[in-house]
A protein has these predicted regions:
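Histidine-acidic metal/acid-base catalytic patches
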Residues: 1-18, 51-54, 71-75, 83-84, ...
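N-terminal ordered "arm"
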Residues: 13-16, 22-35
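A short glycine/small-residue-enriched secondary-structure motif
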Residues: 21, 58-73
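Glycine-rich, positively charged N-terminal anion/phosphate-binding segment
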Residues: 22, 40-61
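Glycine-rich, proline-tolerant flexible connector loops at the mouths of alpha/beta enzymes
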Residues: 31-47, 207
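Acidic, His- and aromatic-enriched active-site or binding-groove loops in soluble protein domains
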Residues: 88, 120-144, 215-228, 327-331
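Active-site-proximal, glycine-rich beta->alpha crossover segments in alpha/beta enzymes
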Residues: 92-96, 100-178
Length: 348
């Protein structure tokens, strides 16, 4: 297992120097953030990310993410050209030494939350989701003031995009995903890059949009679309764990050989389709983080891991979910679990 830490480039309030001071971190997860979805990343821009990390003795082996344009998800005209661009990005990333690319196939919204600063009794704050609040902000009937909307879309553009998806049900989305994978996975194989799809967050349909990377059954179906080792998963415990029907411990062990990237975080479920994010340790939330990490090890996981969304603590301000302090605590906690599990297993 290789512990990593996400960094959002030069504009990130968390600096590479700070990340390099977290004892267990040897590599950053980053991307080229100034090229729109569907564009081709220049070799120079990829090299700049790698060189910036190397200046602080950090590697750059995981990209999160190379966004999949909506035209590909829709199966719209021009999708083939954009798939070609995606393949070229994989070739260039492989040339630069990148080993894993995290991406998602969520229509329109990468993720949704109803509150960005949910206050805890101890004074910390975190991201929260309440289905009733989210549905009250339906873009087809109301104002778009909900945290998490993609600000690159105007209200009119967003409504238009949602209208296009009215003809895309789950099976059509599965078909478009297959088309994408059949093109990119062989290229990823040649480039030495593992592809790791991120689950839908949250793992259920929103505003009539289909969501398909949601549970054990669908993860099995996904892996069979193109049954090659490079076609793998990002195992995000917080995303999948929002649905109490998902047995994360069992899934972690089952899918471990095809999990190339693990996002490990805890959430506290407070009602039906209602949760907020908490500190990483098991005792803080609804997820058995120890059990999940142990299951990953038992299943043979040998990929990249990172602490996921953290709380804002100790007065820190910055990018929601991506402050320094709580994620650093999470990295140390997860690394401690892993070390203890490895050494206890070796001692048997």
């Amino acid at each position: 297992m290789k512990m990593t830490f996400r960094h959002y480039g030069p504009g990130d309030p968390v600096t590479l120097e700070q990340i390099s001071q977290i004892p267990v971190i040897r590599s950053v997860v980053s991307a080229v953030y100034d090229v729109p979805a569907g564009g081709v990343w220049s070799r120079e821009s990829i090299r700049a990310v790698k060189d910036a990390a190397a200046a602080h003795h950090l590697g750059f082996e995981v990209v999160e993410s190379v966004p999949v344009p909506e035209e590909i998800k829709l199966g719209a005209p021009g999708a083939n050209v954009l798939i070609d661009h995606y393949c070229e990005n994989l070739r260039r990333l492989g040339e630069a030494g990148v080993k894993c690319v995290c991406y998602n196939f969520m229509p329109v919204f990468d993720w949704l939350r109803s509150e960005m600063e949910h206050q805890a009794p101890d004074g910390s704050n975190s991201l929260a989701y309440d289905e009733k609040t989210v549905l009250s902000m339906n873009p087809l009937v109301g104002e778009l003031s909900l945290p998490g909307w993609d600000e690159s879309y105007t209200k009119e553009q967003l409504r238009g995009l949602l209208h296009q998806y009215e003809s895309v049900d789950e099976e059509k989305l599965w078909g478009n995903l297959r088309t994408f994978l059949e093109a990119v996975i062989p290229v990823a194989h040649e480039a030495g890059v593992n592809m790791a799809i991120h689950p839908d967050d949250p793992p259920w349909g929103i505003f009539g949009l289909p969501r398909i990377i949601t549970n054990e059954k669908n993860l099995k179906r996904f892996l069979k679309l193109v049954d090659m080792p490079e076609n793998g998963l990002t195992f995000c415990t917080g995303s999948l764990g929002a649905d109490p029907d998902n047995d994360l411990v069992a899934m972690a062990e089952e899918f471990a050989p095809r999990i190339h990237f693990a996002h490990v975080r805890n959430i506290l479920r407070t009602g039906e389709r209602q949760f907020h994010e908490v500190a990483h340790p098991t005792e803080c939330g609804s997820l058995d983080i120890y059990g999940i990490v142990k299951a990953l090890h038992k299943g043979g996981f040998d990929g990249y891991m990172r602490p996921d969304h953290g709380r804002m603590i100790w007065g820190e301000r910055g990018r929601y979910g991506y402050g320094l302090y709580d994620r650093a605590l999470g990295a140390m906690y997860l690394s401690g679990l892993w070390e203890a599990i490895v050494k206890s297993e070796c001692g048997k």
